[in-house]
């Protein structure tokens, strides 16, 4: 959060990657937990909340709408005083940065509870779609208007009148739209059941599992019919569990586990393990397919390898964020790798399919860019390059891996432009990466 990086970082080639990394808290769990704790009856202590731009945005927004919270000393433990479903402040201007995990659930909660709210963010946020969520909410009587381009933030929310207990939302753009409706549903289900129907295929299902798991911890059960229909029975409300612990971020784990797979390892991450509620732990299955050895404990995962990585051809619909790590690991494979069903990359922090294609080509890779797939053929030699990061934390973290020496080809000197963007989810990333690669960065 308050770590300041220079305008660029030069990373030197690294022969080895080994060590132990304590992961920061999960972004997905942190922002969901903050909103649920705010909506709950009672006071919640949140342990190991992620310190990042995205969680800061959520904390500031909650404060502006009257939710009281305190940080415990210098720790990442917070106390949130729940408002039992009724935000005390009914008029606010809320800056949401580029945090999809904040703006989408908050939009639904504020539209359902009612008031006069404006939500806006950085310019990229105003290019990230929110129309499916707004359509679903307005169809049942909320009052949300676009103040810029239709279908995108900024948004102006006014008090509406909810008149229906069944709603529909498309599932193929972002699972965060369904997450937002699910989290707001108990606020509408005071006297009648609420049902949410998903139109079309639902992407990123593991993120919905995180949502349902956390709602359960706050006392709300959701009945689901496959992945097409979700029902919240009447009369349920959020009740504080007292204390809730935030797991380490499984998406952040992917870079270090990939480093262990590429450069031998062993690299161990702590804070997430075999019982994780995050779907991104399944990233390790891809590393295993590529030839890495993975071991898992209750609260740790370790990766190592003893040679060349195999090329992979796989569907990554279920783990789109962690799949970016595979795109760079593919530089070290023995042939052409194909990442399929990654269309959601195009509406993330940047158009990640386009950005990944441009930057991998700088390193010498041959890349075929499809609408929802990437086909990556590694270069004979990884070329030194200055990598642009597109204000996208995952681009910066992924491409650090191109410095590693693998069994088939060696890493190169890599310049990361605008390394500060990692503050979105992992402010200390480059310090942690330098530790496992024994690079004297700072």
UniProtKB/Swiss-Prot annotation:
Gene3D superfamilies attached to this UniProt entry: Enolpyruvate transferase domain
EC id: 2.5.1.19
An example Gene Ontology biological process: aromatic amino acid family biosynthetic process
Residue numbers binding phosphoenolpyruvate: 27, 100, 128, 176, 352, 394, 424
Predominant location category: cytoplasm
One cellular component (GO) term of this entry: cytoplasm
Enzyme class name: transferase
The protein's annotated pathway: Metabolic intermediate biosynthesis; chorismate biosynthesis; chorismate from D-erythrose 4-phosphate and phosphoenolpyruvate: step 6/7
One function term, GO molecular function aspect: 3-phosphoshikimate 1-carboxyvinyltransferase activity
Keyword Transferase: yes
Catalysed reactions, as listed in the record: 3-phosphoshikimate + phosphoenolpyruvate = 5-O-(1-carboxyvinyl)-3-phosphoshikimate + phosphate
Alphabetical list of Pfam families matching this protein: EPSP_synthase
Record keywords, A-Z: Amino-acid biosynthesis, Aromatic amino acid biosynthesis, Cytoplasm, Transferase
Residue numbers binding 3-phosphoshikimate: 27-28, 32, 174-176, 204, 321, 348
Catalytic-site annotation from UniProt: 321
CDD domains: EPSP_synthase
Chain coiled-coil ranges: none
Location(s) in or outside the cell: Cytoplasm
HAMAP family assigned: EPSP_synth
Family: Belongs to the EPSP synthase family.
NCBIfam families: aroA (TIGR01356)
Biological function: Catalyzes the transfer of the enolpyruvyl moiety of phosphoenolpyruvate (PEP) to the 5-hydroxyl of shikimate-3-phosphate (S3P) to produce enolpyruvyl shikimate-3-phosphate and inorganic phosphate.
Record note on quaternary structure: Monomer.
Name this protein carries in UniProt: 3-phosphoshikimate 1-carboxyvinyltransferase
Species in which this protein is naturally found: Herminiimonas arsenicoxydans
Lineage: Bacteria, Pseudomonadati, Pseudomonadota, Betaproteobacteria, Burkholderiales
